[in-house]
Amino acid sequence: MAKKVIKMVKLQIPAGKANPAPPVGPALGQAGVNIMGFCKEFNARTSDQAGLIIPVEITVFEDRSFTFVTKTPPAAVLLKKAAGIESGSGEPNRNKVATVKRDKVREIAETKMPDLNAADVEAAMRMVEGTARSMGIVIED
């Protein structure tokens, strides 16, 4: 028989930098999970993606064991890295902060493809372009 799930926790943690301090500690402590065990395993799995924020979905079972699935970094984080900026525009309709080439957008869309509910890469590209537009980033050919 399958183990009974008691809690699902979704977090966004910098790759390779999970530690028991907030937000990780309190979120997992409430569920009674071995926090250090999670941190070590997460850091080992994400050590190759340093500098990116990795969304993670942790499933906690009745016997306090857990499994977790790492997702691809958010499109906004990948766009900021591609454009070389610290943050998006406060007024994206007025102030444009950077430009990104369309082939870079395709690359980001292909990276995000497993986590997006898009039929093809073109649809995923449109989603990423929409994120860029709302951040004040101009897409050029």
Swiss-Prot record:
Record keywords: Methylation, Ribonucleoprotein, Ribosomal protein, RNA-binding, rRNA-binding
One cellular component (GO) term of this entry: cytosolic large ribosomal subunit
Post-translational modification: One or more lysine residues are methylated.
GO MF, any single term: structural constituent of ribosome
Domain of life (superkingdom): Bacteria
Family annotation (Pfam families): Ribosomal_L11, Ribosomal_L11_N
GO BP term, pick one: translation
HAMAP family: Ribosomal_uL11 (MF_00736)
Name recorded for this polypeptide: Large ribosomal subunit protein uL11A
Protein source organism: Halalkalibacterium halodurans (strain ATCC BAA-125 / DSM 18197 / FERM 7344 / JCM 9153 / C-125) (Bacillus halodurans)
